[in-house]
Amino acid sequence: MSLWKDIKGTILPFWVTLRYLFRRPVTVCYPERKQTPAPRYRGRLVLTRDPDGEERCVACHLCSAACPVDCISMQAAEREDGRRYAAWFRINFSRCIFCGLCTEACPTLALQMTSEYELATRELLQVIYEKDELLIDGCGKNAEYNFYRRAGIGVVAPRGANPGESSPEDVKSNLP
Protein backbone atom coordinates (compact mmCIF):
# COMPACT_ATOMS: atom_id res chain seq x y z
CA MET A 1 0.00 0.00 0.00
CA SER A 2 2.83 2.39 0.80
CA LEU A 3 4.48 1.72 -2.56
CA TRP A 4 1.24 2.62 -4.40
CA LYS A 5 1.01 5.93 -2.46
CA ASP A 6 4.61 6.77 -3.34
CA ILE A 7 4.05 6.07 -7.05
CA LYS A 8 0.82 8.09 -7.05
CA GLY A 9 2.54 10.93 -5.20
CA THR A 10 5.26 11.02 -7.86
CA ILE A 11 3.10 10.69 -10.99
CA LEU A 12 0.26 13.05 -9.98
CA PRO A 13 2.39 16.25 -10.02
CA PHE A 14 3.74 15.31 -13.45
CA TRP A 15 0.17 14.85 -14.71
CA VAL A 16 -0.83 18.30 -13.40
CA THR A 17 2.23 19.81 -15.08
CA LEU A 18 1.42 18.15 -18.41
CA ARG A 19 -2.18 19.33 -18.21
CA TYR A 20 -1.18 22.99 -17.75
CA LEU A 21 1.70 22.79 -20.23
CA PHE A 22 -0.58 23.02 -23.27
CA ARG A 23 -2.97 25.68 -21.99
CA ARG A 24 -2.79 29.35 -22.92
CA PRO A 25 -0.71 31.43 -20.49
CA VAL A 26 -2.68 33.59 -18.06
CA THR A 27 0.03 36.16 -17.48
CA VAL A 28 -0.06 39.45 -19.36
CA CYS A 29 3.03 40.97 -20.95
CA TYR A 30 2.72 44.19 -18.97
CA PRO A 31 4.62 46.90 -20.79
CA GLU A 32 3.29 45.83 -24.20
CA ARG A 33 -0.32 45.13 -23.16
CA LYS A 34 -1.83 47.13 -20.34
CA GLN A 35 -4.78 45.83 -18.38
CA THR A 36 -7.84 47.96 -17.88
CA PRO A 37 -8.38 48.53 -14.15
CA ALA A 38 -11.71 47.98 -12.43
CA PRO A 39 -14.23 50.86 -12.60
CA ARG A 40 -13.74 51.74 -8.92
CA TYR A 41 -9.95 51.40 -9.00
CA ARG A 42 -8.17 53.95 -6.80
CA GLY A 43 -5.13 55.20 -8.67
CA ARG A 44 -3.23 58.48 -8.92
CA LEU A 45 -4.75 61.58 -7.34
CA VAL A 46 -5.49 64.69 -9.41
CA LEU A 47 -6.71 68.22 -8.69
CA THR A 48 -9.70 69.21 -10.83
CA ARG A 49 -11.19 72.48 -12.01
CA ASP A 50 -14.76 73.74 -11.70
CA PRO A 51 -16.98 74.32 -14.78
CA ASP A 52 -15.75 77.93 -14.97
CA GLY A 53 -12.17 76.68 -15.41
CA GLU A 54 -10.88 77.78 -12.00
CA GLU A 55 -9.27 75.57 -9.39
CA ARG A 56 -11.70 73.81 -7.09
CA CYS A 57 -9.29 73.53 -4.17
CA VAL A 58 -9.96 76.09 -1.43
CA ALA A 59 -7.03 74.95 0.76
CA CYS A 60 -9.24 73.89 3.66
CA HIS A 61 -6.67 71.27 4.78
CA LEU A 62 -9.37 68.61 5.28
CA CYS A 63 -7.63 66.22 2.89
CA SER A 64 -4.32 66.48 4.73
CA ALA A 65 -6.11 66.02 8.07
CA ALA A 66 -7.91 62.90 6.80
CA CYS A 67 -4.75 61.34 5.34
CA PRO A 68 -3.56 58.56 7.68
CA VAL A 69 0.04 58.68 6.41
CA ASP A 70 0.33 62.48 6.17
CA CYS A 71 1.43 62.58 2.53
CA ILE A 72 -0.53 65.73 1.56
CA SER A 73 0.71 69.23 2.33
CA MET A 74 -0.35 72.67 1.11
CA GLN A 75 -0.17 76.38 1.77
CA ALA A 76 -3.38 78.45 1.77
CA ALA A 77 -3.66 81.87 0.13
CA GLU A 78 -6.50 84.29 -0.58
CA ARG A 79 -7.35 86.19 -3.74
CA GLU A 80 -8.49 89.81 -3.83
CA ASP A 81 -12.15 88.79 -4.15
CA GLY A 82 -11.94 86.70 -0.97
CA ARG A 83 -11.71 83.29 -2.61
CA ARG A 84 -9.17 80.92 -1.07
CA TYR A 85 -6.84 78.75 -3.09
CA ALA A 86 -3.78 76.57 -2.55
CA ALA A 87 -0.62 78.58 -3.19
CA TRP A 88 1.25 75.28 -3.38
CA PHE A 89 -0.05 71.73 -3.10
CA ARG A 90 2.15 68.67 -2.73
CA ILE A 91 1.46 64.90 -2.56
CA ASN A 92 4.21 62.43 -1.74
CA PHE A 93 3.16 59.26 -3.58
CA SER A 94 5.96 57.25 -1.97
CA ARG A 95 3.97 57.48 1.28
CA CYS A 96 0.43 57.38 -0.17
CA ILE A 97 -1.51 54.15 0.44
CA PHE A 98 -4.31 55.07 -2.03
CA CYS A 99 -7.03 54.66 0.59
CA GLY A 100 -9.25 57.44 -0.81
CA LEU A 101 -9.95 59.13 2.53
CA CYS A 102 -8.67 62.44 1.19
CA THR A 103 -11.13 62.40 -1.70
CA GLU A 104 -14.02 61.65 0.65
CA ALA A 105 -13.03 64.53 2.93
CA CYS A 106 -12.76 67.12 0.13
CA PRO A 107 -15.85 69.38 0.26
CA THR A 108 -15.23 70.90 -3.18
CA LEU A 109 -14.56 67.59 -5.00
CA ALA A 110 -11.22 69.06 -6.07
CA LEU A 111 -9.20 65.98 -5.17
CA GLN A 112 -10.20 62.90 -7.18
CA MET A 113 -8.69 59.50 -7.87
CA THR A 114 -8.04 58.33 -11.42
CA SER A 115 -7.43 54.89 -12.87
CA GLU A 116 -3.78 55.68 -13.62
CA TYR A 117 -1.51 53.13 -11.97
CA GLU A 118 1.91 53.71 -13.53
CA LEU A 119 3.79 55.60 -10.83
CA ALA A 120 6.98 53.55 -10.66
CA THR A 121 10.26 55.42 -11.00
CA ARG A 122 13.87 55.08 -9.96
CA GLU A 123 14.14 58.60 -8.53
CA LEU A 124 12.53 59.33 -5.18
CA LEU A 125 11.91 62.99 -5.99
CA GLN A 126 9.84 62.05 -9.05
CA VAL A 127 7.07 60.59 -6.87
CA ILE A 128 6.55 63.91 -5.07
CA TYR A 129 3.95 65.66 -7.23
CA GLU A 130 3.54 69.42 -7.11
CA LYS A 131 0.38 71.39 -7.87
CA ASP A 132 1.16 71.90 -11.57
CA GLU A 133 1.61 68.13 -12.04
CA LEU A 134 -1.62 67.32 -10.18
CA LEU A 135 -3.88 69.96 -11.75
CA ILE A 136 -5.78 68.73 -14.80
CA ASP A 137 -7.73 70.76 -17.34
CA GLY A 138 -11.06 68.96 -16.92
CA CYS A 139 -13.73 68.86 -14.23
CA GLY A 140 -13.18 65.22 -13.35
CA LYS A 141 -16.01 62.93 -12.31
CA ASN A 142 -18.47 65.64 -11.22
CA ALA A 143 -18.42 68.06 -14.12
CA GLU A 144 -21.47 70.10 -13.11
CA TYR A 145 -20.52 70.68 -9.46
CA ASN A 146 -19.33 74.16 -8.55
CA PHE A 147 -18.58 74.78 -4.87
CA TYR A 148 -18.74 78.57 -5.09
CA ARG A 149 -22.17 78.51 -6.71
CA ARG A 150 -23.45 76.76 -3.60
CA ALA A 151 -21.25 78.19 -0.85
CA GLY A 152 -20.58 81.67 -2.19
CA ILE A 153 -17.73 83.95 -1.29
CA GLY A 154 -17.25 85.38 2.19
CA VAL A 155 -19.97 87.74 3.39
CA VAL A 156 -18.76 91.31 3.75
CA ALA A 157 -22.06 93.17 4.13
CA PRO A 158 -23.90 93.34 7.48
CA ARG A 159 -26.64 90.84 8.21
CA GLY A 160 -29.82 91.47 6.28
CA ALA A 161 -28.14 93.56 3.57
CA ASN A 162 -27.20 90.62 1.33
CA PRO A 163 -29.54 89.67 -1.53
CA GLY A 164 -32.26 87.21 -0.54
CA GLU A 165 -31.60 87.65 3.17
CA SER A 166 -34.12 89.00 5.68
CA SER A 167 -33.07 91.53 8.29
CA PRO A 168 -32.22 90.13 11.72
CA GLU A 169 -34.82 90.27 14.43
CA ASP A 170 -34.20 92.68 17.28
CA VAL A 171 -34.35 90.47 20.37
CA LYS A 172 -34.33 93.44 22.71
CA SER A 173 -37.72 94.57 21.40
CA ASN A 174 -39.24 91.35 22.74
CA LEU A 175 -38.26 92.17 26.31
CA PRO A 176 -40.95 93.52 28.70
Swiss-Prot record:
Binds 2 [4Fe-4S] clusters per subunit. It catalyses: a quinone + NADH + 5 H(+)(in) = a quinol + NAD(+) + 4 H(+)(out). GO terms for biological process: aerobic respiration. Residues 47-77, 87-116 form the 4Fe-4S ferredoxin-type domain. It is a peripheral membrane protein. One of its GO terms (cellular component) is plasma membrane. GO terms for molecular function: 4 iron, 4 sulfur cluster binding; iron ion binding; NADH:ubiquinone reductase (non-electrogenic) activity; quinone binding. Its cofactor is [4Fe-4S] cluster. Keywords: 4Fe-4S, Cell inner membrane, Cell membrane, Iron, Iron-sulfur, Membrane, Metal-binding, NAD, Quinone, Repeat, Translocase, Ubiquinone. [4Fe-4S] cluster 2 binds at C67, C96, C99, C102. Its main location: membrane. InterPro entries: 4Fe4S_Fe-S-bd, 4Fe4S_Fe_S_CS, NADH_quinone_OxRdtase_chainI. It is found in: Cell inner membrane. [4Fe-4S] cluster 1 binds at C57, C60, C63, C106. It comes from the Bacteria. Its EC number is 7.1.1.-. NDH-1 shuttles electrons from NADH, via FMN and iron-sulfur (Fe-S) centers, to quinones in the respiratory chain. The immediate electron acceptor for the enzyme in this species is believed to be ubiquinone. Couples the redox reaction to proton translocation (for every two electrons transferred, four hydrogen ions are translocated across the cytoplasmic membrane), and thus conserves the redox energy in a proton gradient. NDH-1 is composed of 14 different subunits. Subunits NuoA, H, J, K, L, M, N constitute the membrane sector of the complex. Belongs to the complex I 23 kDa subunit family. This is NADH-quinone oxidoreductase subunit I.
